[in-house]
Amino acid sequence: MAASHVAVMVLVLVAACLAGKPDIPNVVWHENAAAAIGTDIAEVARNAGVDVPELLRLLTDRDIGYDTANKRLLYACESMAVPAGATPAAAPGSATAGAADPTDLTLAFKLHSRPGAPRRLVLDFTGHTTTGTAWNSASRPSIVTPPYDLDGVPSTFSDAERRNIIAIWRAVAEDFAAFDVDVTTEETDASGAQLNLADNGARAVIGGSSYDWYGAGAGGVAYVNTFGNTYYDPAFVFPAQLGSGYPKYVWEATSHELGHRLGLSHDGDTVGNAYSTGSGIWAPIMGVGYYKAVTQFSKGEYANANNKEDDLAIITDPTRLMTSARGFMAYRPDDLGSTMAAAAPLAGNPTAADPARTTAAAVGVIERSGDADWLSFAAGAGPATVSIALTPASPDGNARANVDLRLEVWASGAAAPLATFNTAGALLSGANAVTLPAAGTYYVAAIGTGDTDFTSYASLGEYSVALEYPTPSSPPSPSPSPSPSPSPAPAREIRLTLSSYSIVTGRGTGKNPATTYGVSAILIAKDENGTPITGTSVTMGATWASSTYSKSSTKTVTYTTSAAGTFQVFASPTTTVTPGSATLTINTVSASPFTWNQAASTPVMTFSWP
């Protein structure tokens, strides 16, 4: 850590200690909390999801509060606050990245990391009024949080603000990528109503200053162990105390406060730091990760840790009570086989430039500690390249990936890998060369691993793998006598179909916002064998109609499919509040050496809204 960064952190910690806690109705702080709990200690411990000895340890944290009316703990994370303007140099991270952030800034409030997941984390940047919750009281019946704002114009969102929102969402989504949860910036359901998060989610409201109502400098505040219980919604994150909305600070604070909602407490150390800053390139999410490239959940495996709670076990504990249902989050299902025998086969495509070379690609997630994802492919003998891409750094250069991989390449039936790739002091990414000794079946294993500063415990997250290798020879066919004329090779096909869609209903900004409509659709390109095709170029247009909105076609837009063969379309007409419909039309589809099979595709898609 640079000396200037150390100075900033020292100033923050000292300022927090001297500031004193604000006077919030029904809340007592730190050293006064134990006395206020009194004989209710067993109930308070149960509400916090801990035993009594652990509760007594938690009460030594000067940022802990006790809500006497609800017998609940809350954290006011004053030591997460950062002086305005104290923007650090970008944390070091890999320059090699996976798919870039969405460049369509209209998507900023329609983002989803895992649509349809049974749990949701809502990142609310557009302003929020909190009423009827544990945060409210007779003297504070409503808490009005302004929108996320950099330029002093809260009624509209600038391009810079939208880019920051997308960057923050992407980082928080990576922090929770191992779980079956949708991290989303879409705050309303299809009818335009606020999402009901009872028994399924939590909201983080990101905007304004802690001095707007809390009354002291804090990076965020949240009730403990209250995921899925809307009476304790939301968690508050205060950009004004986070480098004036600096994305790295905001996403670290957001994941930290949501961690409290999931039952997690602070990761500090035994040498006087309530919030650990980690070591080397790593820091715990429940400490302070502002100046480290890699932040992860923890179980106290770092030096001098004062908190040994198992973050992943707490988050996935099926007995945790929400409102009436139990189980905060589950791990997301394993997406690829975890052994050589269960390896997912890759169907490669010879390159147009050199048919003697074949490419193949896949995307994966390391969901559990020590998880391994296995892929298989048939190749000829010769040089091969295996490339890894992780969640990319933010546009301002701050790393966001959580997973470190050890990559192994195996030959079929071998007792040891042909090659192992595992960088020290940095996350594995980029191209890795290996020589395949003979034609045959080979395997790639991507394994979550640790590094000098952290273990494999929470080395979890998304990645993509791309391979280039010698094209395997086809088995020779017997030649009858006389030999018939050779048959033409079967045509390769692209079949483009609708994978999923939703009608997106939202609200505009300003004093009298109108209802807005849009279509969010995911399409997938596959070959005749059902294998996803990456790099397919698709041009599409959209036609809109409603009772008060004249029929109109949008300009044609070109999309390119990802490594999973998919791309997302988001289209919306001008603001309208009447019933209507949208028709998306595929105009062209191309990817060498394939031919578009229009009859087996879905070239025209019509969607309606009430």
What are these regions (language model features)?
Residues 303-347, 375, 398-401, 406-415, ...:
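C-terminal edge strands of extracellular/lumenal beta-sandwich accessory domains
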Residues 17-150:
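Primarily auto-inhibitory N-terminal propeptides
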Residues 403, 526-553:
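Short flexible loop/turn segments that cap and initiate beta-strands
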Residues 115-119, 133-134, 138-270, 275:
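Active-site-proximal segment of zinc-dependent metalloprotease catalytic domains
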Residues 385-392, 513-530, 569:
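Beta-strand-rich structural segments
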Residues 428-432, 440, 555-573:
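Glycine-centered loop-to-beta-strand initiation motif
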Residues 380, 488-520, 526:
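Beta-strand-rich domain onsets/edges
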Residues 352-385, 397, 428-432, 443, ...:
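Non-catalytic, beta-strand-enriched accessory regions in extracellular/secretory proteins
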